[in-house]
C-alpha cells in the first residue's frame, strides 16, 4: 500500500470525478475524493467503487470539503499528502453562473488559488502534481476556428471568467514556484453520468421519457448552438496523461467535430424510433414527431443565455502529438449510448 501513488480529486461525485476515480483505482492508486456535504445522497456516480474505510483493502476514501473553505482544503491536502491533485470541483453550469456570479467566482476562481496555496504552504511543490479542469468556454466569442492552446480567450459568462482566472493562476504558480501544474482545456464531454441540467443529458432523458409516454415536450433554447462533444471517459484519461508528463503544460482535448443542438436532438429521438421534423422559425420553431404529428420539442426563450456562445470547435493536435491522446467515440454513438441508458433507467431495468 505504501508504494502506491496517492491522488486527490476535488469534485469526485461529478461525472468527470467518477470516471477519473475509476481510472486511477484501475491504475493502482490510493484515491481520496472531496465531496460537499448535502442533505440528500450525492454519491450515486461512485457507489460502485466505494469501499468501507475499515476494509483493509480499501483504496478509495471520501472527505467532506468545499472549494470556498481554505482551511478545510489545507487540512485535506496535509492529511492525504497526494502525488497528484485533480481539481475538478466547480460551479460548472454556465446559465447558473449568471444567477450566482459571486459564488461561481469564489468556488471556481479563488477555489483554485486555495488549492495551489495549500500545495505551496505545505511544502509539497516538488511532490504534488496539479491538474486544473479548464474549459472551452474560455474561448467564448471565438477569435478563430478551430481553437487551440494559442487561440485568444474571450469569456462570455461569469463561469468562463472565473475559469479564466483559474487558468492564469495555474500558469502563474507553475512559472513562479516551479509547480508541475497543468491546465486541461476540455471541450464539452458527455456520458450517461452527465447531470440532467446539461443540455445533452436533458435531451437524451427527455427523448427517452417522451418515447415511453412519461413526458410531453422537451423545451430548449438555442437550437443552432454548435459544440464539440466527446465522451467523458476518454477525456479523464487525458487528464491523467497530463500528470504523467515530465514537464507540465496546457492542452486542448477535443474531437475536432462540431454538432448542433438540433442535430443532437434528431439523433437522440431517432434512437427511440422517432423521426423529428422541424416547423416554424425562431422562438416559434417546433420539433414534430413525423409519425404522429405531435409537437415534442419547443423553444423556450428563458433558456437563451444573456450572451450566447454559438460555435466551439477544438484542435487537439498538441495532445495527440505530446500525450498520445485521441478521442474514439463519435458524438452520434455518444448520443445513442446516453439514450439507451436513459431508457433503461426509466424502464427500471438499469443494472
From Swiss-Prot:
Coiled-coil positions: none
Entry GO MF terms: GDP-mannose 4,6-dehydratase activity; NADP+ binding
Pathway(s) per entry: Nucleotide-sugar biosynthesis; GDP-L-fucose biosynthesis via de novo pathway; GDP-L-fucose from GDP-alpha-D-mannose: step 1/2
Catalytic activity: GDP-alpha-D-mannose = GDP-4-dehydro-alpha-D-rhamnose + H2O
Named cofactor requirement(s): NADP(+)
Gene3D superfamilies: NAD(P)-binding Rossmann-like Domain, UDP-galactose 4-epimerase, domain 1
Biological process terms in GO annotation: 'de novo' GDP-L-fucose biosynthetic process
CDD domains: GDP_MD_SDR_e (cd05260)
Binding site residues for NADP(+): 11-16, 66-67, 88-92, 103, 163, 189, 194
Keywords: Lyase, NAD, Nodulation, Plasmid
E.C. number(s) listed in UniProt: 4.2.1.47
Keyword NAD annotated: yes
Tagged with keyword NAD: yes
Record-linked InterPro entries: GDP_Man_deHydtase, NAD(P)-bd_dom, NAD(P)-bd_dom_sf
Active site per the UniProt annotation: 135, 137, 159
Domain of life: Bacteria
Entry function: Catalyzes the conversion of GDP-D-mannose to GDP-4-dehydro-6-deoxy-D-mannose.
PANTHER family in alphabetical order: GDP-MANNOSE 4,6 DEHYDRATASE, GDP-MANNOSE 4,6-DEHYDRATASE
HAMAP family: GDP_Man_dehydratase (MF_00955)
Similarity comment: family membership: Belongs to the NAD(P)-dependent epimerase/dehydratase family. GDP-mannose 4,6-dehydratase subfamily.
Descriptive protein name: GDP-mannose 4,6-dehydratase
Source organism of the structure: Sinorhizobium fredii (strain NBRC 101917 / NGR234)
Amino acid at each position: 500500500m505504501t508504494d502506491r501513488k496517492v491522488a486527490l480529486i476535488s469534485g469526485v461525485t461529478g461525472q468527470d470525478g467518477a470516471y477519473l476515480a475509476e481510472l486511477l483505482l484501475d491504475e493502482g492508486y490510493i484515491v481520496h475524493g472531496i465531496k460537499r456535504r448535502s442533505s440528500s445522497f450525492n454519491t450515486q456516480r461512485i457507489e460502485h467503487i466505494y469501499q468501507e474505510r475499515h476494509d483493509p483493502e480499501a483504496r478509495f476514501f471520501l472527505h467532506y470539503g468545499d472549494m470556498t473553505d481554505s482551511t478545510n482544503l489545507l487540512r485535506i491536502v496535509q492529511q492525504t499528502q497526494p502525488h497528484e491533485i485533480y481539481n475538478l470541483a466547480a460551479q460548472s453550469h454556465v446559465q447558473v453562473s449568471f444567477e450566482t456570479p459571486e459564488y461561481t467566482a469564489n468556488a471556481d476562481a479563488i477555489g483554485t488559488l486555495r488549492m495551489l496555496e495549500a500545495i505551496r504552504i505545505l511544502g509539497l511543490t516538488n511532490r504534488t502534481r496539479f491538474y486544473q479542469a479548464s474549459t472551452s468556454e474560455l474561448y467564448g466569442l471565438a477569435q478563430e476556428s478551430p481553437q487551440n492552446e494559442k487561440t485568444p480567450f474571450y469569456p462570455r459568462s461569469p463561469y468562463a471568467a472565473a475559469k479564466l482566472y483559474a487558468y492564469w493562476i495555474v500558469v502563474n504558480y507553475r512559472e513562479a514556484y516551479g509547480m508541475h501544474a497543468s491546465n486541461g482545456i476540455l471541450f464539452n464531454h458527455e456520458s450517461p453520468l452527465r447531470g440532467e441540467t446539461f443540455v445533452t443529458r436533458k435531451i437524451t432523458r427527455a427523448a427517452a421519457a417522451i418515447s415511453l409516454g412519461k413526458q410531453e415536450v422537451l423545451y430548449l433554447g438555442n437550437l443552432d448552438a454548435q459544440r464539440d462533444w466527446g465522451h467523458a471517459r476518454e477525456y479523464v484519461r487525458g487528464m491523467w496523461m497530463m500528470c504523467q508528463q515530465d514537464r507540465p503544460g496546457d492542452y486542448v482535448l477535443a474531437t475536432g467535430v462540431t454538432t448542433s443542438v438540433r442535430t443532437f436532438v434528431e439523433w437522440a429521438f431517432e434512437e427511440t424510433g422517432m423521426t423529428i421534423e422541424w416547423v416554424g422559425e425562431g422562438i416559434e420553431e417546433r420539433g414534430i414527431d413525423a409519425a404522429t404529428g405531435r409537437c415534442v420539442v419547443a423553444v423556450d426563450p428563458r433558456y437563451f443565455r444573456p450572451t450566447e456562445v454559438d460555435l466551439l470547435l477544438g484542435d487537439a493536435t498538441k495532445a495527440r502529438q505530446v500525450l498520445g491522446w485521441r478521442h474514439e467515440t463519435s458524438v452520434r454513438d455518444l448520443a445513442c449510448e446516453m439514450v439507451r441508458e436513459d431508457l433503461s433507467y426509466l424502464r427500471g431495468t438499469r443494472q
